[in-house]
């Protein structure tokens, strides 16, 4: 735990939008008079019909969350049309390809035409307001066009990360009954092609077996690679957009009409479709983008996330574009052609604000400082971190080496469910402590609760809950409101439970300590242990599996799998079987879920009632088996001795 304090930099204080006095004043107003505060800030976006109701939320009973519910607007209009008069020729998106010699600049006027054309293609093929459109694209401008085109006509987009497998894609198509998919022939990552169209074809076949029929597939030509073609179903994007008008009227949308579904891992079963709506989400995404990054007009802003994750939704596309910013989209990876790529892009495009994940920073830190110091990075003014808690060592490296001690770091905590940043420093207002997300954003009321539900005051450790709503909050789990209530509002009554543990220090700063449920945070991305376990058990050699996390020097958490084999399967070569299981999990979920350690075991530690004692598995995976705690309920102590003897993570 770092106790170092970095006071607000004089340079950051000079031109800041929010100083400490303003922060304290606004925060007080936001929690004592949320209606008044959010009415004022709700007007930061344009409304076709202004709202008269601001907040209508209840975390008890059936849980209702409504913001600006009688207002009418359109997200695409707010991200594009309203900027055309004053900044039509300003660059909206800088696209930096995987290949360092390929890039593209798209102005707001060009963005308008591209989005309108894609919107008209969707309409031409029968997509209507409320229909779900699945987007399975690499990090190319067409991914942003597709999202904004859906928003323009009132279709609900479900973006699936292009690194997910056909099986994972199919599950998401089936869950939201999507009949229109937008994909590319291939993606390119680190110089290697990714077979997106082939994956899409496989996913559509899987979905059809579950009675969800995809009627149309719009295919962007990215590489020109060979693809199979479904006559009457598959459409080339470049041919389709050439045949439609570059103008499309934005659909008037109620503030509570759905904007998008984004699937995220839970502690049980299949991923859940997080549903975000229109008005409150855009108010919150744009407001957090402006104040957390202290964004000033004319600055170049780069968030390195993928649009397949919520960070890409809120802080590559919707937040920056609603603010008329220039946002950079990066197709590549941090280590191609080498580990200096990020900093070369910063110099090439004169990036002022840079937002990335601790896992990338740890990997780059390990590669050595010379990859950083050979670039100038002189345009950088602000650094950000997202996806998982940043360890103080990586924070210090980021501050000293990347930022040359002249850039504040905003270490932001939030989740897919939150729509935008909840706990964060503000660069001109907050003294920084390496490893701490510091203080809540306006309107956010964090509460620490012990396992019995008692609220902890002052300096404390506990489960992180939020006691009142904010405009960017998810409204439900798509098609399963009961699961929404059970997951987030049943553990601690009347509060949203984040699933994270947290410590509050003597200065009121918050330190996120990691998940307290069965969800792993791998390289800043959430994966449910249940998801990985069911992938393992679907292999014919596996009888039972349990998955836990363990500390990993680069990824934050690694994936440790305990596997019990079917009778007879143990005759196989264990190393070969390990490789086979790794490939099997990658096929079922995607490379992001690649197991780091697989331990074969004759049995798993269970209570007499048959419950797996995960606490013990975690301790063994962490090589901390000396303090297993109370094992009196164990049905068979011998199982634990075997696990300790054969552990895969011996230090």
Swiss-Prot record:
PANTHER family: ACETYL-COENZYME A SYNTHETASE (PTHR24095), ACETYL-COENZYME A SYNTHETASE 1 (PTHR24095:SF14). SUPFAM superfamilies: Acetyl-CoA synthetase-like (SSF56801). It holds the Pfam family AMP-binding_C. Its cofactor is Mg(2+). CoA binds at residues 189-192, 311, 335, 523, 586. Keywords: Acetylation, ATP-binding, Ligase, Magnesium, Metal-binding, Nucleotide-binding. Mg(2+) binds at residues 537, 539, 542. GO terms for molecular function: acetate-CoA ligase activity; AMP binding; ATP binding; metal ion binding. The lineage of its organism: Bacteria, Pseudomonadati, Pseudomonadota, Alphaproteobacteria, Hyphomicrobiales. Catalyzes the conversion of acetate into acetyl-CoA (AcCoA), an essential intermediate at the junction of anabolic and catabolic pathways. AcsA undergoes a two-step reaction. In the first half reaction, AcsA combines acetate with ATP to form acetyl-adenylate (AcAMP) intermediate. In the second half reaction, it can then transfer the acetyl group from AcAMP to the sulfhydryl group of CoA, forming the product AcCoA. PROSITE patterns: AMP_BINDING. This is Acetyl-coenzyme A synthetase. Acetylated. Deacetylation by the SIR2-homolog deacetylase activates the enzyme. It catalyses: acetate + ATP + CoA = acetyl-CoA + AMP + diphosphate. It comes from Brucella melitensis biotype 2 (strain ATCC 23457). The modification N6-acetyllysine is found at residue 611.
